[in-house]
Amino acid sequence: MSNKSSKTSKVSIDLIKQLREKTGVSIKDCKEALRKHDGDIAKALREIQEQGSAIAQEKHNRITVHGRIASYIHINNRMGSLVEINCETDSAANSEEFAKLCQHIAMQIVACPEIKYVKFEDIPEEIKNHYIEVESQSKDLQDKPAQSKNKIIRGRIDKKLRRMCLLDQANIKDDKVTVNDLIKEKINKFKENIQINRFARFTIGEKI
């Protein structure tokens, strides 16, 4: 009995608040995760993120017919973005939490000049093949055995291409998690599918 009391006492209101700010999930879920891990916020955060991944996988194919279009114009008025983010219900789309998510993603897009695609799977095969062909000509790989060479090429290409994908970028407000992790957290919170559908990034003079 005393052991249970000791474990529960470590779950302070401050810890619950910190975890809720990081994840956006309910107070109840935060408290349960913290109690399970004896007040260890890092482990509790990891569990909530894993739960979000499982829920995201479960809801991945559910139709998202609602959502928002958000925009962000940088303070110098020389850069901006538009993004469409979809969800399943009108109530989620009209919530303050969802509006904040959309605005945050719009800011993220402006902060990441290399991105061209939402996710890795959106990159056309011809683009992937082009990078593979270029990388295979690297001088430092010419004397490598074929198996090692192919493995190195795949690793380098994966790293380069993921720099072009919005979901793979480090969150501008917390670089310990990616944009994909953030979306999964919100899926866990709303208990419905959320998808970044498309985006556009604008910079003055970029087409000149």
UniProtKB/Swiss-Prot annotation:
Q: Which UniProt keywords apply?
A: Chloroplast, Elongation factor, Plastid, Protein biosynthesis
**InterPro entries (alphabetical):** EF-Ts_dimer_sf (IPR036402), Transl_elong_EFTs/EF1B (IPR001816), Transl_elong_EFTs/EF1B_dimer (IPR014039), Transl_elong_Ts_CS (IPR018101), UBA-like_sf (IPR009060)
Offer one example of a GO biological process linked to this entry.
Answer: mitochondrial translational elongation
Check the record and name the Pfam families matching this protein. Answer: EF_TS
Per UniProt, subcellular location reads as: Plastid, Chloroplast
Any single GO molecular-function term of the entry would be: translation elongation factor activity
Q: Does the keyword Chloroplast apply?
A: yes
Q: Name where it mostly resides.
A: plastid
Transmembrane domains' residue ranges: none
Its Gene Ontology cellular component terms are:
chloroplast; mitochondrion
Query: Which SUPFAM superfamilies does the UniProt record give?
Result: Elongation factor Ts (EF-Ts), dimerisation domain (SSF54713), UBA-like (SSF46934)
Q: What does this protein do?
A: Associates with the EF-Tu.GDP complex and induces the exchange of GDP to GTP. It remains bound to the aminoacyl-tRNA.EF-Tu.GTP complex up to the GTP hydrolysis stage on the ribosome.
Indicate the family of this protein.
Belongs to the EF-Ts family.
HAMAP family in the cross-refs: EF_Ts
Protein's recorded name: Elongation factor Ts, chloroplastic
Organism, by scientific name, is Cyanidium caldarium (Red alga)
